Design a protein with these regions (language model features):
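Interhelical loop/hinge segments that connect adjacent transmembrane helices in multipass membrane
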Residues: 2-24, 156, 160-161, 184-185, ...
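Transmembrane helical elements of multi-pass membrane transporters/channels
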Residues: 27-46, 164-169, 186-201, 205, ...
Length: 437
């Protein structure tokens, strides 16, 4: 272990605080602030680009930032954060995690560069897409530091880093965009601000913390890679399925069409957020009930959560049909004409988002049942379905076709995970009855 001063100094000391005991309330509040700003930034930036740089630029940004750039984030992220923050016994050091993340980040940059080289984009679009890949990969690298903050019981530092990095990069991006109206220039400023934020709020801070081991053991990075390869495939395939309709629209329609689709797709992030708030508080209870064999209680919680999601779905679909397009048009005035024909498409996306919430409920059930291999099988099957169907639906139906295939893919995942969850539930019930008999 490295011996660090107990009382941090300099700029890092301002971020860390005076070294007094960290309260749970402080951790929760800063984590909520950071998470909210991080999630909110995507919507703010998307709206700003459409309004300040135009519909075509909005479509390019939607693809670069929320689709391909985010996909490269997932690849660099490697699905490893849940593993790192729960590794409180330090099977792996921070140096091990950082070493593997540097490799995955480097590979994500190379894939991003290769993609724009063969994409046939104009120089400007290729540069914007690649810059957003760099932006997101830096985000993934910062996540390693922020996971280490959390593992050390300093979740508030994770929240502060998220909050301050987001504010800095968004302010630089919006300031440049407002002054120049050029998305490429704004993207350069955003990447510069992201690098500065990473150095200020992650690198400088972690060097002032005690008990952070930078050394990486021999062969540890490969062992860590092997331990998390299933998580990697899960997050990469999951995001591809989630974004397949966007990829198809980017490939077969105009950039401004993708801007419209990105606008009506925006409510899915709210649905995912609400679903997380509904499901996650019950995960520990579900895990305990499953492990202790209280299957009736387990089934009851699943049923009640499904009913809550169903009720929220009815409200969301009704709201989307009556108010969805008018509200989104207020947020995106430049897209009002394109949005005017998208009421059905919006409702399909809302239904797809609800199906995704059901899918997550069954996904967590399979995780609790320790059936991760079946999760990978489901993702692989539906990924093939996405590759085969997304382009065809978009060519045939445009934005509405994209919305329909999104709903279809979410339904396929939900059914796949739901069937396996029910099957393993019945299998355990039969085993219980056999043991009792």
């Amino acid at each position: 272990m490295n011996n660090r001063p107990k009382v941090p100094h300099g700029f890092a000391g301002l971020i860390i605080g005076d070294g007094s005991a960290v309260s749970e309330q402080k951790n929760i509040i800063w984590n909520m602030i950071g998470s909210f700003l991080y999630a909110f930034a995507s919507m703010v930036l998307s709206i700003a680009v459409v309004q300040l740089a135009g519909e075509d630029a909005g479509g390019v940004f939607t693809f670069a930032f929320t689709t391909f750039g985010q996909h490269m984030f997932m690849a660099a992220y490697f699905g490893i954060r849940p593993f790192q923050i729960t590794d409180t016994g330090e099977k792996y050091t921070f140096g091990d995690y950082l070493g593997l993340r540097l490799i995955t980040c480097g590979l994500a940059i190379l894939v991003g560069f290769g993609y724009v080289m063969v994409s046939g984009y104009t120089f400007e679009k290729a540069a914007i897409v690649f810059l957003m890949v760099v932006y997101k990969v830096i985000d993934a690298l910062a996540d390693t530091y922020e996971a280490e903050f959390q593992r050390g019981g300093r979740l508030y530092l994770t929240g502060k880093s998220n909050a301050f990095r987001t504010i800095l990069s968004v302010a630089c991006f919006l300031g440049s965009l407002a002054l120049t109206g050029e998305l490429l220039t704004a993207s350069i400023w955003a990447v510069g601000a992201q690098i500065a934020g990473f150095l200020l709020f992650d690198v400088l801070v972690i060097r002032e913390l005690p008990n952070v081991t930078w050394k990486s053991g021999r062969g540890k990075k490969f062992q860590l890679f092997r331990d998390n390869i299933l998580l990697f495939f899960s997050v990469v395939l999951d995001f591809y399925i989630f974004s397949a309709s966007k990829y198809a629209i980017e490939a077969h329609m105009a950039d401004r069409d993708l801007a419209v689709y990105g606008a009506i797709f925006m409510p899915t992030s709210v649905i995912n957020l609400v679903a997380g708030f509904v499901i996650r508080p019950y995960l520990t209870k579900l895990a305990v009930d499953w492990e202790t064999g209280h299957l009736k209680a387990f089934r009851k919680i699943i049923r009640n959560l499904a009913l809550i999601i169903a009720a929220l779905t009815v409200l969301a679909v009704g709201g989307a049909w009556l108010l969805g397009i008018p509200v989104i048009s207020l947020l995106y005035p430049n897209l009002r004409e394109g949005l005017s024909t998208c009421r059905v498409a919006l409702v399909l996306i809302i239904i797809g988002g609800a199906l995704n919430a059901f899918m997550n409920l069954f996904y967590y059930s399979l995780i609790i049942m320790q059936k991760q291999k079946f999760i990978i099988l489901g993702y692989a099957f539906v990924s093939v379905l996405a590759v085969l169907s997304s382009g065809w639906f978009v060519r045939m139906g445009g934005i509405q076709g994209g919305s329909f295939v999104y709903m279809l893919l979410m339904a396929a995942l939900m059914v796949f995970f739901g069937i396996f969850s029910a099957g393993f539930m019945k299998q355990k019930e039969r085993a219980q009855k056999h043991n009792e008999g």
